[in-house]
């Protein structure tokens, strides 16, 4: 558990994703493990701790998100005039732009993976509720700079908090 939480703070997206999938697996294991923890409420409490961490990750600020519109656009060749014809400075800026664009996309993928896993555990292949339908989800003040899809999700007795959240793209 501790290692997976630490992975969420890695500068490498692949390691952060590994942490996400490890945590998702741990929630599922705890919910299913009625031998070690016979009481379902105790198992849910353990799972809720991980859900809280995943929601905290979603809520955490990501500075490049403020530049989503700019970074989603292609790098304009006409910006070369801003560098007084200095090709070297133009190329440096273009490379920096590409690095930031890649970092934004990687972070989108990590956050979208968390939302996708939540959605699948809330609905997919379940007639009413999914195994995560009774957890609480706190997305307050989150900035969703990526598509969010909770279609067909069943939150059961959950408290779901989106207060203060901003959405660039969402489908409920």
Predicted features along the sequence, with ranges:
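Tandem repeat scaffolds
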Residues: 128-172
